[in-house]
Amino acid sequence: MPPVPFYHDKKLFSGSIAVNAHSMYWVTFTLTPSMQKIRVTGHFQTYGGRQNDIQAVICSDEDFINFRNGHQAQVVYDSGKTTVGDINTTIPDGGGKYVLAFNNSFSMLSGKTVNGEVTLGYEILGQP
């Protein structure tokens, strides 16, 4: 019998976090080569400061090193500075380490609060 896809999901972020001025909050997640149809979905809302803004990005762990240091990086998702954001992006199959980050490094004085939920979804082939 041929293998069939089984859907899995995992919360990457849920609830509320504080992101200080000049700082970032991030979560690292690992994808295995057996994962297929990988998608990150979710919603977030930001409070704090005059602009109530944050930047959400998803990229590989190596690109995150460049991003964190202010260098050019390849990202699979970039919200830009925003108050409210919806994430619905695919990540290429093949495995690797990735990072979901909420960036407030551009804020000189104001910390931000980010509320929301972001989920990693994928399929793995298995026997019925």
Segments (PLM) and residue ranges:
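Acidic, Ser/Thr/Pro
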Residues: M1-P128
